[in-house]
Amino acid sequence: MQLQEIAQKLGCAYEGDPTLEIHSVASLAEARPGELSFLSEARYLPLLEQTQASAVIVEEGLALPCSIACLRGRDPRLLFAQAIELFYQPYRLPVGIHPTAVIDPSVELGEGVAIGPHAVVMEGVKIGDHTQIHPNVTIYPHVRIGSRCQLFANCVIHERTEIGDDCLIHSGAVIGDDGFGHIPLADGSWRRMLQAGRVVLEDNVEVGSNTTIDRAAVGETRIGRGTKIDNLVQIGHGVRTGSHCLIVAQVGIAGSTQLGHHVILAGQCGLAGHLHIGDGVRVAAQTGVTSDVPAGQTVAGYPHQPIAEWRKSMAVQRHLPELQRTLRKLEARVAKLEQNSTDRAPNAKMLEVGVDPETTCSS
């Protein structure tokens, strides 16, 4: 594809030979001749003098240290993401039902649906137009799946789950399994509580590999429109997220916690149950959230605190060994002063009553 053609498809300006041929995309460090790369920040400009890329995507108005063909736009990362789609398309199943798939006669399929080998689709399921069900997927009864969804290999969709349009469910994800509900009994054992609710994924939700989203005991576990969930995330029963949240790998959210819109949960953070997390909250990696967080805050640490306070705490923590040594020295000095004070006390008492301590000691 020629440089000018790429610029036209991306709707951006270009500089350099309009007939320059580009055949793929790559990072600046790994690019070879014929490949397109991008530069997201000015601090990476020195890499331009080392890269073998034939062209790069850069920000409008950014001065370059060397002569290289480029595409210019306001958001180089977005343009690069769009450029990837010009050269690469993910695998799609051929339309139709594979002979080894097991499909209940009551299932309703839209136009252009593809169902791969050994998939199982149980009674009462409805699948929208152009949705793809990849190999070994299991869909339990009375599930609703929208149009243009991708359910990748080995994921499991449990009964009564509702999935909107344009959703991606990656390999090994489990949607709608029982929530973790158990009641303590007098003898110290636990009684399992059936989970009669369901999970709802609104439109354009993405769920990563080996992530689990549990159904509610009653009511719904709901993932808001446009929310993106990474791999290995656990979302407990009754959780509700707003729209366009970002939940990174190994996050755990306990039951009935509610997230506002545009919340970001960084990797390995944990949220206790029955909390309310306001709109626009950002939670740093490995944070333990134990109480409600007001809208707009960025928090870190365990227990969580505003990130500015956490940074101050971390700055002090780095000096703890030095502070400990100083404290021990101070303790030793105080102990010595106290001992000296104790040694002088009897002599001071003798002077008060007119007795000479030296004479007393001599006799």
Curated annotation (Swiss-Prot):
Enzyme Commission number, as recorded: 2.3.1.191
Annotated metabolic or biological route of this protein: Bacterial outer membrane biogenesis; LPS lipid A biosynthesis
An annotated GO cellular component: carboxysome
Domain of life of the organism encoding this protein: Bacteria
Pfam families membership: Hexapep (PF00132), LpxD (PF04613)
Keyword Cell membrane: no
Protein name according to UniProt: UDP-3-O-acylglucosamine N-acyltransferase
